[in-house]
Each structure stands twice: as C-alpha cells, then as structure tokens.
Curated annotation (Swiss-Prot):
SUPFAM superfamilies: Thioesterase/thiol ester dehydrase-isomerase. Belongs to the thioester dehydratase family. FabZ subfamily. It comes from Francisella tularensis subsp. tularensis (strain SCHU S4 / Schu 4). Its EC number is 4.2.1.59. It catalyses: a (3R)-hydroxyacyl-[ACP] = a (2E)-enoyl-[ACP] + H2O. This is 3-hydroxyacyl-[acyl-carrier-protein] dehydratase FabZ. PANTHER family: 3-HYDROXYACYL-[ACYL-CARRIER-PROTEIN] DEHYDRATASE. GO terms for molecular function: (3R)-hydroxyacyl-[acyl-carrier-protein] dehydratase activity. It holds the Pfam family FabA.
Length: 163
C-alpha cells in the first residue's frame, strides 16, 4: 500500500476500492478521513442515505441501519488500516504471498454494544485502533459515532489471508 502517502491522510472511495475487495452492496465506506501507521489508527466515514437497499426491509416505516452493518463498516475500516500497515507489521507474511492477493478477513467480534439507532441523514464516523498483532491475526478496538456520540463499539479480530 505504498501508493498511499502518509502526508495525504484522506483516501476517497476510488482509493478504498483499490484496497478492499468489497463491492456494492457491501462496500460500506465513503472516505478515509485520517490514518496513521505510527499511531495504528484510522478514521473512516459512511454517509447514510435513504437510498441504502437495507432500508427497504429494516424497517420500512422506521428506517434503521442494521447493527451488523455498522459492525461490518467498522471491520472494513479496520481492514483498510491493516492493509496500510501490512508492509511494516506483516512484512514476513507479505513476502510469502507469492504474488497472490491477500486481505484482512474478519476472524472474531467481541464486546459489541449498539447504543442508538443510525438513520438516513446520519454521517457515521468510524475510529479504529490496532491494539494487538500476533502472526497473521490482529485485534482492533473500534467505535462508530454520529455527531460525536458513540452509536456502536466493538473489539474486532482479523486475519491476513489469501483470497
């Protein structure tokens, strides 16, 4: 991921598409607002609109973003952080990849708390921090906020795997 410069902290949706394999309807992030390999942190953004497919059934008269999709957006932000850190943290694994494609895949979710609904018009801001790494597994603490208030928090585990 050396193509992403530490001096330019923002990554647009086209840059996100270069990092993550996710595509519609599961590409859930619109922008990376800030990131730091040194601090092991990332801040991502999801603009929640009424046009999201999941609002057709969740719930038609009271549209609420499903908690599992909030957690998925948190996992995607964490995966991007992992990819941006891969050349330093996972150099031994990257070298063994043999030219194949690797990405971070969700391996575990702990301590999830959904504190309030996320609705159309909200801007979901996700903050993740890598707290532990062993071999190909990393653990991150992540929160999702709307208007500065935490709407969801979780501890996420991801594995750096071939796909």
């Amino acid at each position: 991921m050396s193509q992403f410069n530490q001096n330019n902290k923002q990554i647009d949706v086209m840059g996100i598409r270069k990092i993550l394999p996710h595509r519609y309807p599961f590409a859930l992030l619109d922008k990376i607002v800030d990131w730091s390999v040194e601090d092991r942190t990332i801040v991502a953004q999801k603009n929640v609109t009424i046009n999201e497919d999941f609002f057709n059934g969740h719930f038609p008269d009271f549209p609420v973003m499903p908690g599992v999709l909030i957690v998925e957006a948190m996992a995607q932000a964490t995966a991007i952080l992992g990819e941006l850190m891969a050349e330093t943290l996972f150099a031994h694994v990257v070298e063994k990849a043999g030219g194949g494609r690797r990405t971070f895949m969700l391996a575990g979710i702990d301590k999830v708390r959904v504190k309030r609904p996320v609705v159309p018009g909200d801007v979901l801001v996700i903050e993740s921090r890598m707290v532990k790494q062993k071999n190909i597994i990393c653990t991150a603490e992540s929160v999702a906020k709307v208007d500065g208030q935490i709407v969801c928090s979780a501890e996420l585990m991801a594995a750096y795997k071939d796909y």
